[in-house]
Amino acid sequence: YDSTIRDVLSRLSAPGAKSWPYEPGAAWRDLGANELVLGRDAAYELGGSNNPAGNFTCVTTDGLLVPEDRVTLVGPDIGAIKGDCPFCRVVLLHVNDISGDDQEAFSAIRSMEFVKYHVFPEGYMMRISPENQREQVRVSKQAVKRGLSFRNIGNSFIKKYKENSLIDHVQIFFVTGDRAVCCELSATAKKVDAITLTLNHIMDGLATDCSVCSFKPVCDEVEGLKELHFKKGEKPMNV
């Protein structure tokens, strides 16, 4: 995922972006289960009204790419948003060396991705679709009145990620309001998902003729996937 991480960092290093270091005490109250925020109780829905809405997670062992825990916001904060708008959330994880074989390492990475299903900030109802990488969020009127911010939400996510001893650093980005950027990031989310599916295909040890494999475009584009296939003992044909 390293090339994708570099692209994300370049794309989201926009002037005017707000950024905060990780502060566990700034995490919002977690309810332990997803809260039902009804339409009449919502101030607005991030990604609602057919706006783009995406999320994805990238993992790296390169500490230079993700050197610290940080929350970054590109766009208006929760209190400044007045209605449904484009939205995207991106998480970059720096992990330490994962022991075990490739399958165990891959399983560990997948478990990190599932953290997003275990964060339940009060007044912030996430609706995540793994099929199309969409993430819509209903924000309650009460949470807005109480001063909920993306700094709070980001700290809540990082706090949950830090429960995993394999994770060294977390950087989380929230993008709001910019349709073009959110559309681009939604496309990146699909690319990241394709990489993950290809890794899963390789880890299953499936021999394949590269000329007919549906994952060939991904292997051609992403450095290291073909080498991993060689390592698994299934030399691709017609490379």
Residues covered by each model-derived region:
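N-terminal cysteine/histidine-rich coordination modules
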Residues: 214-215, 235-239
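Long, charged N-terminal interaction/targeting segments
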Residues: 27-171
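Ordered core of a single globular domain
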Residues: 2-16
